[in-house]
């Protein structure tokens, strides 16, 4: 169960790209707490400097400010690395619709640069962030690998392209790659600010600030919200997975289903705040329902998520109350 007792070689070096972001900084923290070395790479375009500064006093941590769109930077970052955890990407479905060229350059070319740099440097395992958005308009629930629909956004296209490139690097070059199809990850250090903030931290910040949150649509959308600790487990267990599991992508979720309106009222109750939400239009490119079949990750990665939504949301509420 979990990841804290996983064992790697004592001198193992992990490269975490996107290390100043939400998932990346949590991966850095977990690996450092386990006693292993971490090299972080981030251009700080969306990541936060404070998510780097918190580790700079740790002798096992090294930070490179750089852009995955630059191949030489990727080569430098991969020198001597055993495991790559490639989280560097721009998120947000709506923003990708506004900025398709940038998303292609950053999310596709950047990942390809990292794959090639990892290959040339003899990296053992390459674990990368994909997304549940690759399921597109496929209505069948739960979402199962191999049953994908039409893609609904440029962001989804970038993630599917990343998966296809990773498969090629496993097939032709023997690089063990593992795609993490994240389902609505939430938890500590997720940025609540800006027009593209994820719904849980955004609701929490607005409620704690005395604002009235707006729910896009009718609130009856459902998602498989996944606490950050489960995502850390999936990434680290992928680093220990067999080569037979390589060249594939895996649903990383809890396997539950929560409705936005229920989450909203759960947050107001937990915070002791009585305020009705506003309702706005549906977001472009969004699906109505999402729920993951995680049996493949359980079987091939040993993934066994410990953190339910209820347990995770309690931890998230406490973190935001202390840190906003």
Residue ranges and their predicted role:
Residues 166-169, 180, 187, 203, ...:
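Generic structural signal for nonpolar/small residues that stabilize regular secondary structure
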Residues 45, 200-201, 232-236:
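Short alpha-helix within the catalytic core of nucleotide-sugar-dependent glycosyltransferases
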Residues 2-7, 27-33, 69, 207-324:
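C-terminal substrate-binding subdomain of Rossmann-fold SDR/epimerase-dehydratase oxidoreductases
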Residues 161, 165, 169, 199, ...:
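Hydrophobic alpha-helix immediately C-terminal to the catalytic Tyr-X-X-X-Lys motif of short-chain
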Residues 113, 190-191, 221-223:
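Heptad-repeat alpha-helical coiled-coil signaling segments
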Residues 192, 198-199:
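Conserved catalytic loops of nucleotide-sugar-dependent glycosyltransferases that act on lipid-linked
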Residues 187-189, 284:
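Short beta-strand->alpha-helix junction loop in the catalytic core
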Residues 1-185, 239, 305-307, 315, ...:
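N-terminal Rossmann-like NAD(P)+-binding domain of SDR-like oxidoreductases, especially those catalyzing
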């Amino acid at each position: 169960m979990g990841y804290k007792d996983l064992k790697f070689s004592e001198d193992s070096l992990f490269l975490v790209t996107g290390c100043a972001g939400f998932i990346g900084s949590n991966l850095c923290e977990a690996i450092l707490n386990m006693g292993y070395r971490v090299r972080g790479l981030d251009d700080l375009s969306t990541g936060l400097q404070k998510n780097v500064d918190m580790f700079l006093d740790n002798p096992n941590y090294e930070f490179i400010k750089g852009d995955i769109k630059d191949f030489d930077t990727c080569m430098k970052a991969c020198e001597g690395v055993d495991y790559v955890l490639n989280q560097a990407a721009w998120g947000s479905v709506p923003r990708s619709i506004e900025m398709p060229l940038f998303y292609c350059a950053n999310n596709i070319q950047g990942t390809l640069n990292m794959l090639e740099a990892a290959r040339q440097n003899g990296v053992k395992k390459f674990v990368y962030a994909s997304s549940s958005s690759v399921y597109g308009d496929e209505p069948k629930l739960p979402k199962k690998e191999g049953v994908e629909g039409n893609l609904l956004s440029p962001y989804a296209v970038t993630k599917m392209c990343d998966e296809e490139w990773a498969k090629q690097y496993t097939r032709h070059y023997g690089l063990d790659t593992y795609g993490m199809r994240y389902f609505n990850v939430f938890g500590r250090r997720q940025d609540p600010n800006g027009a593209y903030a994820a719904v849980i931290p955004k609701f929490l910040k607005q409620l704690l600030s005395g604002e009235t949150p707006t729910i896009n649509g009718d609130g009856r959308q459902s998602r498989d919200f996944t606490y950050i600790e489960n995502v850390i487990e999936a990434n680290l267990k992928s680093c220990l997975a067999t080569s037979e599991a390589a060249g594939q992508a895996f649903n990383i979720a809890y396997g539950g289903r929560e409705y936005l309106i229920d989450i909203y009222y759960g947050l107001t109750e937990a915070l002791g705040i009585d305020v009705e939400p506003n309702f706005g239009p549906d977001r472009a490119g969004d699906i109505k329902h999402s729920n993951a079949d995680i049996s493949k990750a359980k079987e091939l990665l040993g993934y066994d998520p410990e953190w339910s939504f209820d347990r995770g949301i309690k931890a998230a509420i406490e973190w935001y109350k202390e840190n906003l």
